[in-house]
Amino acid sequence: MASKITIFFVLALVVVCTMMVCIPTATAELVLPCKTTYDCVNLPCLGRPPLCINGQCKCTTTLTHQAKLDNLRTMNDAKTCKYTSDCDPRMRYSCVSGSYICLNGFCTCT
């Protein structure tokens, strides 16, 4: 009977020690070979455009030239300003780039 209790405690000790050990996890990254950017259209980039860089498909975070121009357009209800400090600091959340300036008397996303 004592041997069964001993085995139970040893087994419980092994289980507790196993649960305390941190097992490192690896983050997986999808690597697709490519020759042109067209080869990367199936890469899941969550709204970011994929590009072929050094023979591998990569998700980019850069804005296109047109997106930057669209972001520069002032809104009809844009606040007037003399200095950038006159603009509402919460405006950065509505700008794609996250930054703004006082341009030609209006608070404008950059």
Swiss-Prot record:
Location within or outside the cell: Secreted
Disulfide-bonded cysteines: 34-52, 40-57, 45-59, 81-102, 87-107, 95-109
UniProt KW rRNA-binding keyword: no
Organism superkingdom: Eukaryota
Signal peptide: 1-28
Entry keywords, A to Z: Antimicrobial, Disulfide bond, Fungicide, Plant defense, Secreted, Signal
Major place of residence: secreted
GO biological process: defense response to fungus; killing of cells of another organism
GO cellular component: extracellular region
Family under the similarity heading: Belongs to the DEFL family.
Name the UniProt record assigns to this protein: Defensin-like protein 296
Organism: Arabidopsis thaliana (Mouse-ear cress)
